[in-house]
Structure formats: C-alpha cells, structure tokens
Amino acid sequence: MHEQLHEGADGREIPFEFERKFFVANLPQAAREHGSQQIIVQAYVFAQGGYAIRVRLSFRGMGEIEFPKFAEAVDFLGAYERKILTQLLSRSETADSASVQATIAVKSPSVNGERYELEHEMDLDVAVQILQRSGNLVLKSRYSLWVSEDGWEFDVFAGQNEGLIVAECERLSPVVDLQIPDFAVTEVTADARFTNDSLAKEPWNQWDTQFRQELAARGPFFLDLRSA
C-alpha cells in the first residue's frame, strides 16, 4: 500500500491511495518466481457503505504454503481462516526468516481508483486477539513485482474466497494511461464485490458463477482513464 499525501482544505496533509484492480484467471509465472511474497490474514471491525476499518497480519519469509481445501460444512464463519492463522503464528515462531507485522487501516469508498487510506502499525497481540474473535476474515497470498514501469500486487485468495485472483496496480498519483497487461481479464476497480471488506462478508464462492456468466455475456471492460 502506497500512500500519497494531499493537502486538505485546512492545510493538513491527507493520505490517499491510487490503484486499479483487475480480475485475473491465472497467477503469472513471473509473479510466483520473482515476486516478493507475503501471506495476509485480515478482518474488518467496521465496514459499511465503502467505509472500513481493517486489522491485518502480514507474514513474510514463510515460503510457499499450499493451503488445504476449504470445506464449507465445517469451515464457515471464519473457522478456516482462524485455523490457518494459528498455524501461521506457530510457524512464524520457528522459521528463522519469518516476520509478522500487524496494522490497522481506515478506508473510504473508492472513486475511479482513488480513496482515502490511513494505515499504522499496531500491537501484534491485540491484532491477533481481534482476528481470533472475528467471524468474517480474508486470507490471501500476495505477490508483488514490477511489470514494466508499474508496481503490481497479485492477491491469490484462499478459504471461502478460494479460486479468486485479483491484480492491483498502484501509483503515487491517479493510475491513468495504463497499458493493460495480458494477464488482466477485465477491470473490477468499480465493482464493490471485489473489495476485501465485501469479500469478507460475501465471499467469492457465493457468486463466482454469476460473475463468470456476466463476464461471458458482456465481455471484458476497462476504464478509459487518461491524463489531462
């Protein structure tokens, strides 16, 4: 997450993020082989109308982890994600290269890929306790790398969102004049269903078939955002 500070009406600097989001069918091999990887577990203590407060744990240096299959009969209400969280915390204590970071973020709704986002580190134990008590969690592996001149992040979701891959292009200013890469199937920047706070409550496994039918009917779509 890259924050850019903009000056508000009262002269104070306000943090914003600029990103565009795309549905991806398959994780590019370059991302798996050359991207930096982290595993993310997060929950939303508030999410309504596009506004959200998020608590996140980011695990780095864990290596490639193959998550077990999600079983809806027993893994509902965050049981799967909390189980994986416990395993990640245990593994992070024994892996020499592992590190864990806890953060809390406040977000506004996104308009054309621009939104307010303020993120700070928080106490690890407090973050763990919040996540362990949360029913709606998001679990994903994130691969970050440069594609041409842009930084990209590929989120490969697990648990109740298993099968979903989303790519995000972030800049320090509005993402305009973007050369759409081949891996981008269609743009979902303006589709609220693909926000993580929405995926925590209405996961991919509840509407993936509907989305694929919509995509087949209308075809790919990309925002035409150009510099002035």
How does the language model describe each region?
Residues H2-A228:
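Phosphate-end processing signature that detects enzymes handling 5′-triphosphorylated RNA
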